[in-house]
Amino acid sequence: AVAAVPPKRELRWTMLFHDLGKPLCRTFDEQGVGHFYGHTAISAQMAEDIMARLHFEKTLRDRIRAQLACFDDMFRPERAAIHKEMARLGTETVQNLLYTKQADNAAKVPAGLERAQAPWHEAQKIYDELISEGACCSIHELKISGEDLAALGYHGREIGAVLARLLDEVAAEK
């Protein structure tokens, strides 16, 4: 899975770290099928410890931490759902999440790979469309600013709250 992501440090480290906790969480159900409940949190903590010991620079640690935090997030391959995730996590984090999901699936589902990958390929296609259209994915990209809201009589934190609500509405494509 590590080799299946683009050669970016944070992606390669994320793929290496994301399943570290599985051996500590492995259980078997009645049919003898293995499960790894809670491995995400344990993997993230183990990654934190390793990154601290290896003295990773803060920006790299932050990027890896962000990827690990949303690694198990699932979103529907629908335009509004992906747009909302792009607004919530940032466009780069969503792109990296798509890379890591596709690589993770490729590593564990050899039979029926195309069917397992189909939702992620569709999500990637939608992501690419949103990027090429210049979709608004952050407060700074809104056509209205805090200054505009202040001119309309909004004050302080209320301005940030209104901008956040507007971004949510734009991302939901309402």
What residue spans do the PLM features occupy?
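Charged substrate- and nucleic-acid-binding regions of tRNA-handling and nucleotidyl-transfer enzymes
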Residues: 49-53, 108-174
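Divalent metal-dependent catalytic cores for phosphoryl transfer on phosphate-bearing substrates
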Residues: 1-116
